[in-house]
Design a protein with these regions (language model features):
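The feature captures the beta-strand-to-loop junction immediately N-terminal to the Walker
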Residues: 44-46
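Helix-to-loop junction immediately C-terminal to a conserved catalytic motif
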Residues: 59
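ABC ATPase NBD coupling module
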Residues: 75-90, 95, 119-123, 139, ...
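Conserved ABC ATPase "signature" region
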Residues: 109, 120-138, 185-189
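Conserved ABC ATPase signature
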Residues: 142-146, 150
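Conserved catalytic motifs of ABC-family nucleotide-binding domains
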Residues: 163
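Catalytic Walker B motif of ABC-type/P-loop ATPase nucleotide-binding domains
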Residues: 167-171
């Protein structure tokens, strides 16, 4: 983690010294984490390691007992989620977040209408999102008729309406079939190409390893190791307590 006195890239996410206790027992023990613009970062670990708690402290769903969260030089440790969103952090929960009875187009337009745009600008942004995410052919479909993979595409497109600096994805590979997983990985790669930082937590380590530039592996409330996938997967503690000795990325 860089010095607090250094000039920060306005789109760099930093979590510094995050701590969370439950009934006096530490769940998260001083976690430091960085996501650069245009970088895909995975937060992984066994159940009970503290990764979900850490992720939710960054999202704003859980308040940290100690530590700070920054986007660039903007501190947002105690900001509610809506303020974090205005500052540039979009969050995509695991559960379906689309309006089920609205069409795909209406789902995107509902968010576009919250922005200060002319009718023409709204229409242009809508068409760009539909095209970029390959959902133009679904524009008039009600959200409840979509497959898991199609719904995920719409949700990510919706999260990008506000042009965030960073997107936080909670279990993006859960509840979708293998073909759709590859599809979503392609979309996440697109986010990287647009210069958007991506922080992902997911139980599917194998799929995460295929797309992440860097990983943070949590064991017992702390970061055991961080680095590129080929480095962290060789760590003996990670092998012993999380991935297993026979683990291979297919």
């Amino acid at each position: 983690v860089t010095s607090d006195h250094a000039v920060q890239n306005p789109k760099r996410l930093r979590a510094v010294g995050l701590v969370k206790r439950y009934n006096g027992t530490p769940a998260v023990r001083g976690v430091d984490l960085v996501v650069e613009p245009g970088e895909i970062v995975g937060l992984l670990g066994p159940n009970g390691a503290g990764k979900t708690t850490t992720f939710y402290m960054i999202v704003g769903l859980i308040q940290a007992d100690r530590g700070q969260v920054f986007l660039g030089d903007q501190e947002m440790t105690h900001d509610p989620m809506v303020i974090r969103a205005r500052k540039g952090i979009s969050y995509l929960p695991q559960e379906a977040s689309v309006f089920q009875k609205l069409t795909v187009e209406q789902n995107l337009t509902a968010i576009l209408e919250t922005l200060r745009l002319t009718a023409m600008e709204r229409k242009q942004r809508l068409e760009t999102l539909l095209r970029d995410f390959g959902i133009t052919h679904l524009r008039r479909q009600k959200a409840y008729t979509l497959s898991g993979g199609e719904r995920r595409r719409v949700e990510i497109a919706r999260a990008l309406v506000v042009s965030p600096a960073l997107i936080l994805l909670d279990e993006p590979f859960a509840g979708i079939d293998p073909i759709a997983v590859g599809d979503i990985q392609g979309i996440i790669a697109q986010l990287k190409e647009k210069g958007i930082g991506v922080l992902i937590t997911d139980h599917n380590a194998r799929e995460m390893l295929k797309i992440a530039d860097r990983l943070y592996i949590m064991i017992k409330g702390g970061i055991q190791i961080s680095g590129p996938p080929e480095v962290v997967t060789r760590d003996p503690v990670v092998r012993n307590q999380y991935l297993g000795h026979d683990f291979e990325v297919l």
